[in-house]
Amino acid sequence: VNQDLEPLNQEGMANPANRFHPWIYKEHPEVNCIIHTHPTHVAALSMLQIPLMISQMDVCALYKDCSFVGHWPGVPVGNEEGILISSALGKNRAVLLSHHGQLVTGKTIEEACNLALLIERAAQLQLLAMSAGQIQPIPHDLATEAHDWVSTDKRNKVNFAYYARKALKKHSDCI
């Protein structure tokens, strides 16, 4: 489809909820991949209307890199949602959408895929930790160091390759 959601081959129909994607590409020229999903733990956390809290080393790629939309605007079928989500994203690569799900962006497919997996893991850890007590903050300097250490093209490619091998082993008939 083109940015007006018109099918390029004149067949089929675009999902009108994809209308916000062109807004992100327009406002964030560094983005080459968008992944928007509603995974279980992200969806559960979004129902609580609280931001994602990064306080564990393995998910520090999202430290200070995940925005939060606290008000659900409804099904994202109009330009208003594109403006809202694109604006909320700001300089971050991810956004948690209340009562909805998540959206991650990447300069590469590998980066976006890794962030999509990590945001679900982070939400799962947050929900588990919240059920046990009060989450303790991770030291800013260490979290920033971990964020920068894991947020490299090389690590994104290596992580993506690992997940691809794992998926192919489980679903060998997909190719």
Region spans (language model):
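Glycine-rich flexible loops
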Residues: 1-175
